């Protein structure tokens, strides 16, 4: 064998030639060797000839004619598909015909014995009975249609569909002219449907025609042509999915024109502006939630998007059905949301409303975020408060309600601010009075009281007057709140009966004496000249008023009640000096008559009403008074009757026109004085009187604004008494110039009026 590369045929021929030259003797020896039995190839296992392949560098069995025949018999060989190499082998066999025939192995005549696969013979097919789902129906009316036949046969089972055309597998046979013959074929999906149709539909009648149903049998008509290409259904998966779809319980879609998928998406514009989210990014979530709540009324929402960077303020809402989207468009188009008129329309299916953030915007956003992180904690809190206030100042855009008027939020904000303004002055007044009471406890001297009087006027008088004159409702609300808190205090009576009463009595006496000395130097002998009150007199009167206020504030800080201080002082005076109290009561009657006369000039009927109410309240309280103090009360009543006459003469000298009301006021005053002795153990009654007094002087303030400068001093005194209304009864007794010892009567008068 040469070392050149030969192709397969040349190489095979070369091997045959070499076999002729060198292999005849060996073959003869192998065949004539009787010592061993031949194997299946006709050769001894140990006598198999090998040859060396120079190209592959290996030994291979030597190819002989017997080897080729055996190989063809084992691995299948047909005469029609003989290869050229086999032809060459035949040529070699012709050339070696002189060899004995026994050397040739017999060629196999039956290929099946050698392991060749048997191919299925092409011919007519037969359907197995257990898999046959076809039903043949005869006796149908000649005018029956395919739809009517489908409707008839579908009553007994699911009709199979063609996987490619998706049409029902039914057939109505026709003759040569195209007319219906009256028979048809139906293919069911399950075998059970065939049995059901045989039981129920067989021998049934339709329009007078009797039907006959049987299992379909397929027969060959004519001769079978095997040359025709056999139809193959390779779409097994498609067929299986079609069957599963038919077996599904879900109903089929409604027949009708199908709408596009993008018609289910609604585009809403002008919902917001991108700048709205810079101050408060959380507004985005609020708008999304409001839109979700509103759109859920029209149907099921599948998806909701807000394009926060779009300049038109675009939002998209995806519904389940196009009809729901149509309803949403019809309802929301043209409505108002957050002060903006929105528009709603169906999505065209192509427009992309997503606006990407530019590199510049991204850099600015990152810089702002970095600045926020580097800022101290205090500035962060300030920025948060600024953002909250900015969101409150946003106005109509923050309403975020459909079809809402833009000014609603502003009105609500104004109401809130007004309510806060009403409450703030009241709290400030209480706080200042408490501070003043604490300062007065440190030093109860007259000089200290006078020094602190300008400060107290600035703190108490000015804010109280401004709040009461500018907004009367505010003072009324404040007094009501104080009344409620005082009336609801059950601890006041127990505190008054405590051992602290002795020390408080002494303190009150010292204060009253100091006030009396100060008032003697400040009194003006000309009592009738009320119009000529000088600035010195006004300042002195203010000082005396402030001293009484400080006495009341001292009592408030000590006991938490506004009447206990003065009542304790009154009790001390009655116990220690009976005659001195009678003198003070006479002067008190005069002062009360002055109040009555001036009230009559001002045409203030509120005082009468309040005094009557006080009388009725005190009548109820008299039933619960202790019997041990009745004697003192009777003595006081007789003294008051004698003092009433003196008060009347004093009022006539001043030219006041209150004679018609003196008797009524005197009766009310008698009741007031009778109660003063009994109120030592019942301070709860004083709280109710205090509430009535506050209402009285608030009415006086509203009436005093209408008069001349002649009554300005009285107005000021009345306003001061209003400021002290929560602290001490009838503060109006300090009007005008007072007689000697009037400052002492101020404090005792407040006690008697309780």
UniProtKB/Swiss-Prot annotation:
Residues 405-415 have a biased composition (Polar residues). One of its GO terms (biological process) is double-strand break repair via homologous recombination. Residues 90-122, 462-476, 508-538, 553-563, 580-590, 652-674, 714-725 have a biased composition (Basic and acidic residues). Keywords: Acetylation, Activator, Chromosome, DNA damage, DNA repair, Isopeptide bond, mRNA processing, mRNA splicing, Nucleus, Phosphoprotein, Repeat, RNA-binding, Spliceosome, Transcription, Transcription regulation, Ubl conjugation. GO terms for molecular function: chromatin-protein adaptor activity; poly-ADP-D-ribose modification-dependent protein binding; RNA binding. This is 17S U2 SnRNP complex component HTATSF1. Phosphorylation at Ser-748 by CK2 during S-phase in response to DNA damage promotes interaction with TOPBP1 and double-strand break (DSB) repair via homologous recombination. One of its GO terms (cellular component) is site of double-strand break. Residues 133-218, 264-349 form the RRM domain. It comes from the Eukaryota. It is found in: Nucleus; Chromosome. InterPro entries: Nucleotide-bd_a/b_plait_sf, RBD_domain_sf, RRM_dom, TatSF1-like, TatSF1-like_RRM1. Component of the 17S U2 SnRNP complex of the spliceosome, a large ribonucleoprotein complex that removes introns from transcribed pre-mRNAs. The 17S U2 SnRNP complex (1) directly participates in early spliceosome assembly and (2) mediates recognition of the intron branch site during pre-mRNA splicing by promoting the selection of the pre-mRNA branch-site adenosine, the nucleophile for the first step of splicing. Within the 17S U2 SnRNP complex, HTATSF1 is required to stabilize the branchpoint-interacting stem loop. Belongs to the HTATSF1 family. There is a cross-link at residues 429-430 (Glycyl lysine isopeptide (Lys-Gly) (interchain with G-Cter in SUMO2)). The modification Phosphothreonine is found at residue 633. SUPFAM superfamilies: RNA-binding domain, RBD. The RRM domains mediate interaction with U snRNPs. The RRM domains specifically bind poly-ADP-ribosylated RPA1. The gene is HTATSF1. Residues 539-552, 564-579, 591-606, 613-633, 640-651, 675-713 have a biased composition (Acidic residues). Residues 381-754 are annotated as: Mediates interaction with the P-TEFb complex. The modification Phosphoserine is found at residues 387, 403, 407, 409, 445, 452-453, 481, 485, 494, 498, 521, 529, 557, 561, 579, 597, 600, 607, 616, 624, 642, 676, 702, 713, 721, 748. The modification N6-acetyllysine is found at residue 297. Residues 259-353 are annotated as: U2AF homology motif (UHM). The modification N-acetylserine is found at residue 2.
């Amino acid at each position: 064998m040469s070392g050149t590369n030969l192709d397969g045929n040349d190489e095979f021929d070369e091997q045959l030639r070499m076999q002729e030259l060198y292999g005849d003797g060996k073959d003869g020896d192998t065949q004539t060797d009787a010592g061993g039995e031949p194997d299946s190839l006709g050769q001894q296992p140990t006598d198999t000839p090998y040859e060396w392949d120079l190209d592959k560098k290996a030994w291979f069995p030597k190819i002989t004619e017997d080897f080729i025949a055996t190989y063809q018999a084992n691995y299948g060989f047909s005469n029609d598909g003989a290869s050229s190499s086999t032809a060459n082998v035949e040529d070699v066999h012709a050339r070696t015909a002189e060899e004995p025939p026994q050397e040739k192995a017999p060629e196999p005549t039956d290929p099946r014995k050698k392991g060749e696969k048997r191919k299925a013979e092409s011919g007519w097919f037969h359907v197995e009975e257990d898999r046959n789902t076809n039903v043949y129906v005869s006796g149908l009316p000649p005018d029956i249609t395919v739809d009517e036949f489908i409707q008839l046969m579908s009553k007994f089972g699911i009709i199979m569909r063609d996987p490619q055309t998706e049409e029902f597998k039914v057939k109505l046979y026709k003759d040569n002219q195209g007319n219906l013959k009256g028979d048809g074929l139906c293919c069911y999906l399950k075998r059970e449907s065939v049995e059901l149709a045989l039981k129920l539909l067989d021998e049934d009648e339709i329009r007078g025609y009797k039907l006959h149903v049987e299992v379909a049998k397929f027969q060959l008509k004519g001769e079978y042509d095997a040359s025709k290409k056999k139809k193959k259904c390779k779409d097994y998966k498609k067929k299986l999915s079609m069957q599963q779809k038919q077996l599904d319980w879900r109903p089929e879609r409604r027949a009708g024109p199908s709408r596009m998928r993008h018609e289910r998406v609604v585009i809403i514009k002008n919902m917001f502006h991108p700048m709205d989210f810079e101050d408060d990014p959380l507004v985005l979530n609020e708008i999304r939630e409001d839109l979700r709540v509103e759109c859920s009324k029209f149907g099921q929402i599948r998806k909701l998007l807000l394009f926060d960077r779009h300049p038109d303020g675009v939002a998209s809402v995806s519904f389940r059905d196009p009809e729901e989207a149509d309803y949403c468009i019809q309802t929301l188009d043209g409505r108002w949301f957050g002060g903006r008129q929105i528009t709603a329309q169906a999505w065209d299916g192509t427009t992309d409303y997503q606006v990407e953030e530019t590199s510049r915007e991204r850099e600015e956003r990152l810089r702002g975020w970095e600045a926020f992180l580097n800022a101290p904690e205090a500035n962060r809190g300030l920025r948060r408060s600024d953002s909250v206030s900015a969101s409150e100042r946003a106005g109509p855009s923050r309403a975020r309600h459909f079809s809402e008027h833009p000014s609603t939020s502003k009105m609500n904000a104004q109401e809130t601010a007004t309510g806060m303004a009403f409450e703030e002055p009241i709290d400030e007044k209480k706080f200042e009075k408490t501070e003043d009471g604490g300062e007065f406890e440190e030093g109860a001297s007259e000089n200290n009281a006078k020094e602190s009087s300008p400060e107290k006027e600035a703190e108490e008088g000015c804010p109280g007057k401004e709040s009461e004159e500018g907004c009367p409702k505010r003072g009324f609300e404040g007094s009501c709140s104080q009344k409620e808190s005082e009336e609801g205090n059950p601890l006041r009576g127990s505190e008054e009966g405590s051992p602290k009463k002795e020390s408080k009595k002494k303190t009150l006496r010292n204060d009253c004496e100091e006030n009396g000395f100060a008032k003697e130097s400040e009194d003006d002998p000309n009592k009738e000249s009320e119009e000529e009150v000088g600035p010195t007199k006004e300042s002195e009167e203010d000082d005396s008023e402030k001293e009484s206020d400080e006495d009341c504030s001292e009592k408030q800080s000590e006991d938490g009640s506004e009447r206990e201080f003065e009542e304790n002082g009154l009790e001390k005076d009655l116990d220690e000096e009976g005659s001195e109290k009678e003198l003070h009561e006479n002067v008190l009657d005069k002062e009360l008559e002055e109040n009555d006369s001036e009230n009559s000039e001002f045409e203030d009927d509120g005082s009468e009403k309040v005094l009557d109410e006080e009388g009725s309240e005190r009548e109820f309280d008299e039933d619960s008074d202790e019997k041990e103090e009745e004697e003192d009360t009777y003595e006081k009543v007789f003294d008051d009757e004698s003092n009433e006459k003196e008060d009347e003469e004093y009022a006539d000298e001043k030219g006041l026109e209150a004679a018609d009301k003196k008797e009524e006021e005197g009766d009310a005053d008698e009741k007031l004085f009778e109660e003063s002795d009994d109120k030592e153990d019942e301070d709860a009654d004083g709280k109710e009187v205090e509430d009535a007094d506050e209402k009285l002087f608030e009415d006086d303030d509203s009436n005093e604004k209408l008069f001349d400068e002649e009554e300005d001093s009285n107005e000021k005194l009345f306003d001061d008494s209003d400021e002290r209304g929560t602290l001490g009864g009838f503060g109006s007794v300090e009007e005008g110039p007072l007689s000697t010892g009037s400052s002492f009567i101020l404090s005792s008068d407040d006690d008697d009026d309780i």
